[in-house]
């Protein structure tokens, strides 16, 4: 399959730069995955598509204020560090700008020494493994010194960093938000529960690989980035019970989907587990975990467009995207949502 098969034209003016005042006032495009029929609603209306006994799966990861600005100890040169993934202990994979002159053994100083990062390994494309030295709790140091990392297509500064977190964000570790969840309010979640719909949580820490463009023409040759995930016994039991009773598992976001499908690929049922997934979902993939998907509108030629095309089909997805462009839906992280069911 060719990468060009997943392209569409998107006017830059439709890339949402700021969130709407109210999370659930975004628009919702409902796509029947089997017929391609489209329905235009608002996100708060999503509750009408849930039935008692269904389970809604949310990713409770929390975005770290992981962009740090500091100085190179040896020269005093300014440097920017974006923390991506915790490797082990205090060792982190990071992106540096500028990276060229940061070699193994060099040290970076942030906040007058409140965080010191020592380079222990050089990677490709500006990547490094850095060993962090700090006093106290890392999250507290990051809250004090760090800024929220926003996707490269968002050019405006975010007035309220909490708007790039879901209302249920809990487990710190992501470099980007699981954006399908940004539309939910506490009130909407309570109404969903009152309807008899179960709420379950998984954790997948989103890396910047989610924004990395596919660089090969044949998508079979693409190598996915790895991301850390975990599922509790409580969630596994609830999902197994949902499936056994003939009810539906509705996944909120591609991150939840990748977690659920990874676990069901590797096990005959849902189990409590954790690990790293590089699952690549594209047309031809056999879904074993999810029955519905809530997701935002994704970048042209991205692996996420491929994932939603696999869940419905490419023709229906591209038709929905063209209709969304025509009707001036808002796209990407702060944009509108789709329900594919």
From Swiss-Prot:
Gene Ontology, cellular component aspect: cytoplasm
Listed GO MF terms: S-adenosylmethionine:tRNA ribosyltransferase-isomerase activity
Record EC number: 2.4.99.17
InterPro entries to which the protein is assigned, alphabetical: QueA, QueA_dom1, QueA_dom2, QueA_sf
Keywords: Cytoplasm, Queuosine biosynthesis, S-adenosyl-L-methionine, Transferase
Intracellular or extracellular location(s): Cytoplasm
Catalytic activity of the protein: 7-aminomethyl-7-carbaguanosine(34) in tRNA + S-adenosyl-L-methionine = epoxyqueuosine(34) in tRNA + adenine + L-methionine + 2 H(+)
GO biological process, one term: queuosine biosynthetic process
SUPFAM superfamilies, per database record: QueA-like
Transmembrane segments: none
Name of a matching Pfam family: Queuosine_synth
Pathway membership: tRNA modification; tRNA-queuosine biosynthesis
Xref: Gene3D superfamilies: QueA-like
Entry function: Transfers and isomerizes the ribose moiety from AdoMet to the 7-aminomethyl group of 7-deazaguanine (preQ1-tRNA) to give epoxyqueuosine (oQ-tRNA).
Subunit structure and binding partners: Monomer.
Family: Belongs to the QueA family.
The protein, known as: S-adenosylmethionine:tRNA ribosyltransferase-isomerase
The organism of origin for this protein: Staphylococcus epidermidis (strain ATCC 12228 / FDA PCI 1200)
Recorded name of the encoding gene: queA
């Amino acid at each position: 399959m060719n990468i060009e098969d997943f392209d569409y034209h998107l006017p830059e003016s439709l890339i949402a730069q700021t969130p709407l005042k109210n999370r659930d006032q975004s628009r919702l495009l409902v796509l029947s995955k089997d017929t391609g029929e489209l329905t235009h609603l608002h996100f708060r209306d999503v509750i009408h598509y849930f039935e008692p006994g269904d389970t809604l799966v949310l990713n409770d990861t929390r975005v770290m204020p992981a962009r740090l600005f500091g100085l190179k100890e040896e020269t005093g040169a300014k440097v920017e560090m974006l923390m991506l993934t915790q490797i082990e202990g205090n060792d982190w994979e990071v992106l540096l700008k500028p990276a060229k002159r940061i070699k193994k053994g060099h040290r970076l100083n942030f906040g007058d020494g409140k965080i010191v990062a020592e380079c222990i390994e050089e990677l490709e494309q500006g990547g490094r493994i850095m060993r962090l030295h700090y006093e106290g709790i890392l999250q507290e140091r990051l809250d004090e010194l760090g800024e929220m990392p926003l996707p490269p297509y968002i050019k405006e500064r975010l007035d309220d960093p909490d708007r790039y977190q879901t209302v249920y964000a809990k487990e710190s570790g992501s470099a980007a938000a699981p954006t399908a969840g940004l539309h939910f309010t506490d009130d909407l979640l309570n109404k969903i529960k009152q309807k008899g719909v179960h709420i379950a949580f998984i954790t997948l820490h989103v890396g910047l690989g989610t924004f990395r463009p596919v660089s090969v023409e044949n998508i079979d040759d693409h190598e996915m980035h790895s991301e850390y995930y975990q599922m509790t016994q409580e969630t596994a039991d609830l999902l197994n019970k949902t499936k056994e009773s003939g009810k539906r598992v509705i996944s909120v976001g591609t991150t939840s989907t990748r977690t659920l499908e990874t676990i069901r690929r590797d096990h005959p049922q849902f189990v409590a587990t954790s690990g790293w997934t590089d699952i690549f979902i594209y047309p031809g993939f056999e879904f074993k975990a999810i029955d519905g998907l809530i997701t935002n509108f994704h970048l042209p030629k991205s692996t996420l467009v491929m994932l939603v095309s696999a869940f419905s089909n490419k023709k229906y997805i591209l038709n929905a995207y063209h209709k969304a462009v025509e009707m001036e839906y808002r796209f990407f992280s702060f944009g509108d949502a789709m329900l594919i069911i």
